[in-house]
């Protein structure tokens, strides 16, 4: 009986480019906006995929990382379930490899399904260049890339 029930997890290992070294500005229990038109409004981060940290340290994420989230406000069929999301904006300032600094005015993410495909068809607001390099599908749907 227990072997038949299978939870939804990422089915395949999603191939992304190596991540840039960025300041991790989102940690567990952080609320963020959903920047796509999937029907979710507010997301809460409850975990970070591929995070290797110290014992008892809260997992943290930077733009481009995959977060495990729950929908706090949005369509009823999305709420009270575990989803995956890609973080695209953070308020915390971080340094780029060319020496410039960048920050955004909100924390935002876009929902993905368990195959790594975007749930929404549009992305509202700017997307950093680092995320556009890692996720080509996000760069094609973004309104502006900073």
From Swiss-Prot:
Coiled-coil positions: none
Source species, domain of life: Eukaryota
Family annotation (Gene3D superfamilies): Ribosomal protein L14
Keywords: Ribonucleoprotein, Ribosomal protein
GO CC annotation terms, alphabetical: cytosolic large ribosomal subunit
Pfam families membership: Ribosomal_L14 (PF00238)
Keyword Cell membrane applies: no
The family this protein is said to belong to: Belongs to the universal ribosomal protein uL14 family.
PANTHER family: 50S/60S RIBOSOMAL PROTEIN L14/L23, LARGE RIBOSOMAL SUBUNIT PROTEIN UL14
Organism: Encephalitozoon cuniculi (strain GB-M1)
GO biological process terms on file: translation
Name by which UniProt lists this protein: Large ribosomal subunit protein uL14
NCBIfam families with a match to the protein in the record: PRK08571.1
SMART domains per UniProt: Ribosomal_L14
GO molecular function, one term: large ribosomal subunit rRNA binding
């Amino acid at each position: 009986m227990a072997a038949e029930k299978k939870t939804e997890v990422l089915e395949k290992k999603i191939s992304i480019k190596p991540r840039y070294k960025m300041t991790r500005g989102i940690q567990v229990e952080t609320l963020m906006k959903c920047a796509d038109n999937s029907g979710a409004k507010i997301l809460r981060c409850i975990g970070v995929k591929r995070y290797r940290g110290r014992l008892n340290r809260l997992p943290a994420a930077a733009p481009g990382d995959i977060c495990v989230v729950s929908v706090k406000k949005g369509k009823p069929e999305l709420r009270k379930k575990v989803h995956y999301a890609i973080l695209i904006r953070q308020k915390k300032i971080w340094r780029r490899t060319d020496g410039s600094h960048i920050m955004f005015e909100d924390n935002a993410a876009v929902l993905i399904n368990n195959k790594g495909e975007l749930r929404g068809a549009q992305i509202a607001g700017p997307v950093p260049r680092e995320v556009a390099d890692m996720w080509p599908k996000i760069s094609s749907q973004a309104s502006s890339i900073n």
